[in-house]
Amino acid sequence: VTLPWTPSRLGNLTGKRVIVTGATNGVGLGTSRALAKAGAHVILAVRNTELGEQRASEIGGSTAVAKLDLADQSSVRAFAGLIDEPVDILINNAGALTDRRTETVDGFEMTLGTNLLGPFALTNLLLPKVRSQIINVGSDAHRSATLRIDDLHSRRHKWTRLGAYAQSKLAVMLWGLELDRRLRAAGSPIVTQLTHPGWVASNLSNLGDSPLMSLAHKGVKMVADRLANDIDEGAAPTLYCISEPIPPGSYVGVTGRFGLRGGPVLIGRTPLACDYDAAARLVAFAERETGTTLEV
């Protein structure tokens, strides 16, 4: 009989330094809490440092809080400049789902800038300091995505919140594919994996301020609270990547139907998310946009 996975599988992580982006709520908070409990030194990379300090005190253990706004490339560079010691594990967890099309201070479509281009630049800048593992939180939303390499910022095609989110997560999947390919080709000791946390109720953003949208949001929340993973369950696929001897480049999701909830398990991805030519083009695009290079 196979016992269900639990965070106790992490063992003793004392001496390990881990960066978790988006650590103040949702999956990032659940991830940080479990890692700190296992003895790791967790750096909470967050937009709101006041809330970050509050979360750090709640989490206990060995933690530090640092400012990071992934929608601002100057903030990404400033954060990377603060990291002067080796990092064992980098967890690119933070993400955005916006109500309308807006742009970052760098002129990127907000969803793409936060979910792909910020983490991409951060990883490139920190790569010389990473010793062991990079985990990128993707999503099964990639299964419904259309990839427009020539219009990833949705300047010419119609923008929709779910379309932009799905495309950004497909882009993360492709980046992860190419990152894994390069690390293995170089014989690097660093491994990388992708995860899908399931449907986590606390990560759902507001759907707008209109009465109709508020009503829709309440309906979604009511269903989500019944069907979704909680934040600890949502963190499990990420933690599973750390505790289990899974192959480099794996995609870890959840056991339940439709990828909604359940325990961590290795899952498949769409053919497009396995397209190495598309992945190489995606990485070249991200390098041009961020002015950083994936040097493996």
Regions found by a protein language model. Name each.
Residues 1-5, 261-272:
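Short, contiguous pre-domain boundary segments
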Residues 270-296:
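C-terminal amphipathic/interface module of NAD(P)-dependent oxidoreductases
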Residues 72, 151, 243-244, 275:
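Polar helix-capping/helix-linker motif
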Residues 1-211, 289-296:
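Rossmann-fold NAD(P)H-dependent dehydrogenase/reductase core
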Residues 55, 175, 234-237, 282, ...:
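Alpha-helical packing segments of well-folded alpha/beta enzyme cores
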Residues 155, 211-222:
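A short C-terminal helix-loop "cap" of Rossmann-like NAD(P)-dependent dehydrogenase/epimerase domains
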Residues 168, 218-267, 276-280:
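C-terminal helical subdomain
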Residues 44, 68, 226, 271-274:
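Pocket-edge positions in alpha/beta enzyme catalytic cores
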